[in-house]
Amino acid sequence: MNNRVHQGHLARKRFGQNFLNDRFVIDSIVSAINPQKGQAMVEIGPGLAALTEPVGERLDKLTVIELDRDLAARLQTHPFLGPKLTIYQQDAMTMNFGELSTQLGQPLRVFGNLPYNISTPLMFHLFSYTDAIADMHFMLQKEVVNRLVAGPNSKAYGRLSVMAQYYCQVIPVLEVPPSAFTPPPKVDSAVVRLVPHATMPYPVKDIRVLSRITTEAFNQRRKTIRNSLGNLFSVETLTEMGIDPAMRAENISVAQYCQMANYLSENAPLKES
């Protein structure tokens, strides 16, 4: 039997489809999410409804975003979930989560078993809507979860770590083996909870500046910041901020990146685009 077929649906590689089918894992994820009636629950990539069904059982309404036309059609005709669902058959990368929150009248609780081929860009898309989001629970490649939670002075620490922790508290929830999916992915998976900060611990004046600094630093992560960020900061400026110019990108904390961004915003602000 083709191990890419599950419940009569052929998993599509171009959509990064791996369908969750382990009942213990599913129950553990639903318990971690703890959905309640009246909340604005939004699922990204419901697939064959492994999470949609147990979450939907606890709710009166559930919004789902599914790119695959065939899977969206299956959900529309689902025997008991259908009437509860509002289905957006579109790419989550094009979704305006701010508008959706306004429509639903409250911050969103977002969850999903995310396609691994788009998980990182989708994270950055969601970070831009954290004002409209209460929390997020995602199944991701374990390596991506490691990067989300990583602290300075580790190989996993990178731009994703800094930006995720700038916007959210990041909490690992559960590790998941390949055997929990059909077809089994070639990598281990993990569930992570992201809770947007109610008050930013390190506010920045212009998020575009933080994005630029982290991009330039981590694109040249083996260089010292005196070299990788030499076009933005002098050695004297870094020293005045208490940041050692001999450090590399992975040695600098989220707080220090935010400090650098605010210095640049005040002294060399980006032009409005």
From Swiss-Prot:
Reactions performed catalytically: adenosine(1518)/adenosine(1519) in 16S rRNA + 4 S-adenosyl-L-methionine = N(6)-dimethyladenosine(1518)/N(6)-dimethyladenosine(1519) in 16S rRNA + 4 S-adenosyl-L-homocysteine + 4 H(+)
Compartment(s): Cytoplasm
Assigned protein family: Belongs to the class I-like SAM-binding methyltransferase superfamily. rRNA adenine N(6)-methyltransferase family. RsmA subfamily.
Keyword presence, rRNA processing: yes
Gene3D superfamilies noted in UniProt: Ribosomal RNA adenine dimethylase-like, domain 2 (1.10.8.100), Vaccinia Virus protein VP39 (3.40.50.150)
UniProt GO cellular component terms: cytosol
Enzyme superclass (EC): transferase
Signal peptide interval: none
Function: Specifically dimethylates two adjacent adenosines (A1518 and A1519) in the loop of a conserved hairpin near the 3'-end of 16S rRNA in the 30S particle. May play a critical role in biogenesis of 30S subunits.
The protein's name in its UniProt record: Ribosomal RNA small subunit methyltransferase A
Main subcellular location: cytoplasm
The organism's taxonomic lineage, starting at the top: Bacteria, Pseudomonadati, Pseudomonadota, Gammaproteobacteria, Enterobacterales
Known EC number: 2.1.1.182
Keywords assigned: Cytoplasm, Methyltransferase, RNA-binding, rRNA processing, S-adenosyl-L-methionine, Transferase
Gene Ontology MF terms in the entry: 16S rRNA (adenine(1518)-N(6)/adenine(1519)-N(6))-dimethyltransferase activity; RNA binding
Binding site for S-adenosyl-L-methionine: N18, L20, G45, E66, D91, N113
Alphabetized SUPFAM superfamilies for the sequence: S-adenosyl-L-methionine-dependent methyltransferases
Superkingdom, natural source: Bacteria
InterPro entries referenced in this protein's UniProt entry, alphabetically: KsgA/Erm (IPR001737), rRNA_Ade_diMease-like_C (IPR023165), rRNA_Ade_Mease_Trfase_CS (IPR020596), rRNA_Ade_methylase_Trfase_N (IPR020598), rRNA_adenine_dimethylase (IPR011530), SAM-dependent_MTases_sf (IPR029063)
